[in-house]
Amino acid sequence: MMELVTPTIRQGGVNTVFVMPNLVPPVTTVDRALEYKQRLQAIEPNVNYLMSLYLHETVTPETIIDAKKRGITGVKSYPAGVTTNSSSGVIDYTQFYPVFAEMERQDMILNLHGEVPSTGDVTVLTAEERFLPTLLELHERFPKLRIILEHCTTAAAVEAVKKCGPTVAGTITAHHLSIIIDSWAGDPFCFCKPVAKTPADRDALLRAAASGNPKFFFGSDSAPHPAVSKRGGDKIAAGVFTQPHTTQLVIDAFEQACENGVLKEEDITPEIVEGFMSKFGRNFYGIGEEQKEFIIIDKKDEKIPNILKSDKVDVVPFRRDQQTWSVSWSA
């Protein structure tokens, strides 16, 4: 899988990625994270890979000190059992308070998959909103800790991020700017965690993305799965593969939102797009621009393929067979 999808990063207009640690087994040590980075660089050297650790009981304050010294960017938290390869995830955040305190001292980033497990009266539709008090509590206890609420899907999540101080931000994906409940209910290739919600929630995400507020920036959460695991069997895999056209899909979503009256065309300026897609995220992560690159987006005859294949695996991309924008790189 890695050999098939890593070359698609730059195809989607992206040159910097925060690499998720939810492999099997999860990436819980600095050595393993750096070994993973070397493998990625061997496939595509022209990408800046920001490596992370999986928040796990074996991660200690001493691990954080070592991680900072050796160039690890952050730690990713997955609630236990909520999404792909999260069985080793968090049940009780309080046990990690010493880790968070050290992350705050070391100025590392905590990336949150913001959902609670679907138990009792919690469903996939309410799991994100039920998590938001945890976000607020973590921010209150560790006000200098940089926290990212990843892949926001609700208006409530947008408001929670706004309520927090400047050390808290939220990412928004390309697919959540266009899909709603009905999309994934009828198409497994639109199913991901957290799931897309209502049209009102989608519109709140669009407005946040186009607001120019630096607390909101793009994060693809592109999650490739073998096509067979998306078509049925025991359980459909949660994840949407957007990377080969992820920048183009954001532009498509903005364009559609303008046609639907959710956004105004005059408000989607180059500065707004650059801020959401690049500048705000780079600033939050503290990434320099030693080799600044630009992408050129053009309305050519670009079509998203039906499937990506290798000798070992097939992956179906989001919006397969549909027309989109083309992307080229310029120094």
Language model features: what each stretch is:
Residues 23, 54, 115, 152-153, ...:
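Catalytic metal-binding/acid-base residues of hydrolase active sites
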Residues 41, 49, 68, 123-143, ...:
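Short, electropositive alpha-helical surface patch
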Residues 59-77, 84-218:
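Histidine/acidic residue-rich metal-binding segments in metalloenzymes
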Residues 214-217, 223-288:
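His/Asp/Glu-enriched, well-ordered alpha-helical/loop segment
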Residues 277-312:
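Structural signature of the urease/amidohydrolase superfamily beta/alpha-barrel
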